[in-house]
């Protein structure tokens, strides 16, 4: 293999040295090559590469009428050439790769009578050869959702495996398919197409393992069972359409009373919710309200009404699949608690002020009365002692009464004198 690579490099270097000495009569730079290939391919399968000579200015330049004036040159080592065909101004080759890897294939066009002349056009393509099966896992559903990899729950999905084998290398092989749908369901089939229905929302990965077996005749005329495998997967996002919005909340409320509505969405999040109060139940127009992102299937909406009247909550919700509208009527009555709320503090304040005024008035009146009844307040310790402690310091009650009469001369005598007559 190393010798073949060095041989190819030597040939390219040799051509690069000879090209500058080629005549310039050929229309170099006016044409280009369009290359197509059916790569990637599995090892042992044929790969087709085609090259077509076209004008660079998208067709305004006329192509040569005689196709025999030009010749195509290919370099495809270490790939094995299995076929070559030329028709008009195009050339096609078929090659086979027996080891996996990335392999460049080069092609250029020269005048047919001067293959060492400067190329009219050149190009190259890289072939991808793998030891595994080549194919695609395709998921389809009878819906027209504009979002890639998004599908509906409770709707049949068609999952297909499309084998990429343009050379029919595996036309005699038997295939076995092992499916894993990512929700715990697994199955093994001999058919490359299955139908499945997801009942829950979420993101799932469908995994498929393909095994191909066939018989191959060896050079010694013996038969051997050959096998190739391949692993494929596809990511699916299962969504639910919004079937409606359930609104839980009062339909009658008073002003200045906080109201809470609970919105239950019958669909899969994430959602975009928008609402607005209107006199009538009419759908919301675009840009009429501010959208709110909701990551669950429930949302609480709060509002306080200041004016009585009839209102309607216009609610709109949407996810990446669908949208829906809902309405909720509510009547707002004037609040009965509102006057009492303002009157009670005022009445309390007035009552406190009146009580304080009455207290101060009675206090001043009591002080003035005491001053009138006692114009000359007693002085010294003697008066205080006589008034307060007299009954305890005097020996007899008669002495206490005499002292009282001295201090209160205006009081009448406590008893009248008794006269005694002797006959």
UniProtKB/Swiss-Prot annotation:
Glycans are attached at residues 34, 197, 300. Coiled coil: none annotated. Residues 25-339 are extracellular. Gene3D superfamilies: Immunoglobulins. Residues 1-24 form the signal peptide. The chain crosses the membrane at residues 340-360. Keywords: Glycoprotein, Golgi apparatus, Membrane, Signal, Transmembrane, Transmembrane helix. This is Transmembrane protein 130. The lineage of its organism: Eukaryota, Metazoa, Chordata, Craniata, Vertebrata.
């Amino acid at each position: 293999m190393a010798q073949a690579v060095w041989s190819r490099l030597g040939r390219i270097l040799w051509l690069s040295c000879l090209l500058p000495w080629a005549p310039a009569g050929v229309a170099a730079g006016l044409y280009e090559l369009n290359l197509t290939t059916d790569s990637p391919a599995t090892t042992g399968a044929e790969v087709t590469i085609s090259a077509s000579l076209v004008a660079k200015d998208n067709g305004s330049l006329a192509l040569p009428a005689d196709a025999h004036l030009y010749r195509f040159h290919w370099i495809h080592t270490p790939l094995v050439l299995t076929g070559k065909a030329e028709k008009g101004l195009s050339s096609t080759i078929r090659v086979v790769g027996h080891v996996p890897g990335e392999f460049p294939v080069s092609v250029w066009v020269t005048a047919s009578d001067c293959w060492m002349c400067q190329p009219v056009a050149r190009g190259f393509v890289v072939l991808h050869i793998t030891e595994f099966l080549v194919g695609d896992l395709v998921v389809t559903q009878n819906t027209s959702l504009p979002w890639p990899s998004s599908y509906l729950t409770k709707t049949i999905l068609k999952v297909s495996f499309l084998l990429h084998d343009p050379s029919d290398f595996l036309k005699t092989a038997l295939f076995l398919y092992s499916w894993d749908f990512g929700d715990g369901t697994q199955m093994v089939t001999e058919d490359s197409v299955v139908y499945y229905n997801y009942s829950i929302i979420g993101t799932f990965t469908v995994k498929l393992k393909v095994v191909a077996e066939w018989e191959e005749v060896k050079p010694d005329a013996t038969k051997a069972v050959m096998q190739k495998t391949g692993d494929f997967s596809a990511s699916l996002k299962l969504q639910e359409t919004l079937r409606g919005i359930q609104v839980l909340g009062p339909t009658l409320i008073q002003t200045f009373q906080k109201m809470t509505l609970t919105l239950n969405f019958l669909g899969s999040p994430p959602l975009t919710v928008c609402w607005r109060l209107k006199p009538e139940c009419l759908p919301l127009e675009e840009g009429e309200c501010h959208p709110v992102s909701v990551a669950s299937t429930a949302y609480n909406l709060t509002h306080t009404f200041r004016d009585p009247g009839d209102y309607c909550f216009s609610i709109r919700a949407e996810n990446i699949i669908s949208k829906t509208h809902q309405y909720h009527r509510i009547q707002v009555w004037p609040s009965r608690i509102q006057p009492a709320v303002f009157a009670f503090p005022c009445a309390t304040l007035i009552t406190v002020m009146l009580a304080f005024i009455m207290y101060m008035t009675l206090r001043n009146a009591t002080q003035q009365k005491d001053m009138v009844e006692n114009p000359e307040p007693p002085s010294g310790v003697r008066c205080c002692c006589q008034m307060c402690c007299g009954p305890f310091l005097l020996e007899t009650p008669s002495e206490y009464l005499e002292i009282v009469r001295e201090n209160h001369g205006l009081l009448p005598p406590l008893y009248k004198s008794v006269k005694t007559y002797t006959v």
